[in-house]
């Protein structure tokens, strides 16, 4: 006869889940959606009830949640997360793809985590101008887990942390794949895209106006000999 009394509900079972927010950031083509899918499937194998939400205006892959390499998963399309709140309350794990496009991403994730849900968000951290994308970075201090993935630079094959737009559109929200964007490293980000005119009309990827030689001159201000001259005397 066993002397061990096990509880009816084990601590790790779905009915005893503790809310949390997991954030997966990175540029395009860094594997954010693939990682989101992997994490959700991991919970599905453990018999957790899961829901994936995708941005409704992204119609490239029909109504399914899809990675760039065409792996798919059933998803619920939405433009505002509050519109699918009732469906989200009925599951244990919520996956959100393209989180940067949802204006209510912060409030929704915090409310769901406080309700005991595990919320996994995949999102771009920056725009093609390397500025914060929507409200997504406001989710970072609320999250239990945050990772930033890198891609491979599509121009020089080094590590890529940024997204570079190939076209001339000015608006932030332009949905597309490799036909409109490249993942790039720091050096390639500032290179003029092929087909774009040089000069003041091509400012998207330019840090400061001026000639290329001026950047080199600026670096010389911080040459080792100058730094030594500014050091306090012993």
UniProtKB/Swiss-Prot annotation:
| A GO cellular component entry from the record | nucleus
Coiled-coil positions are: none
* SUPFAM superfamilies (alphabetical): Glucocorticoid receptor-like (DNA-binding domain), P-loop containing nucleoside triphosphate hydrolases
Q: Where is the active site?
A: 98 (proton acceptor)
Keywords for the protein's UniProt record, in alphabetical order: Acetylation, ATP-binding, Cytoplasm, DNA synthesis, Kinase, Metal-binding, Nucleotide-binding, Phosphoprotein, Transferase, Ubl conjugation, Zinc
Instruction: Give the sites modified to N-acetylserine.
Output: 2
Q: Where in the cell is it found?
A: Cytoplasm
GO molecular function per UniProt: ATP binding; identical protein binding; thymidine kinase activity; zinc ion binding
Q: Where does Zn(2+) bind?
A: 153, 156, 185, 188
Enzyme Commission number: 2.7.1.21
Q: Which residues bind substrate?
A: 128, 172-176, 181
Residues that the record marks as modified (Phosphoserine) are 2, 13, 231
UniProt xrefs under InterPro entries: P-loop_NTPase (IPR027417), Thymidine_kinase (IPR001267), Thymidine_kinase_CS (IPR020633)
What enzyme class is recorded for this protein? transferase
Comment on protein domains = KEN box sequence located in the C-terminal region is required for its mitotic degradation by the APC/C-FZR1 ubiquitin ligase and interaction capability with FZR1.
Q: How does it assemble?
A: Homotetramer. Tetramerization from dimerization is induced by ATP and increases catalytic efficiency due to a high affinity for thymidine. Tetramerization is inhibited by phosphorylation at Ser-13. Interacts (via the KEN box) with FZR1.
Query: What's the further remark here?
Result: Two forms have been identified in animal cells, one in cytosol and one in mitochondria. Activity of the cytosolic enzyme is high in proliferating cells and peaks during the S-phase of the cell cycle; it is very low in resting cells.
Q: Which family does it belong to?
A: Belongs to the thymidine kinase family.
Q: What is this protein called?
A: Thymidine kinase, cytosolic
The protein's organism comes out as: Homo sapiens (Human)
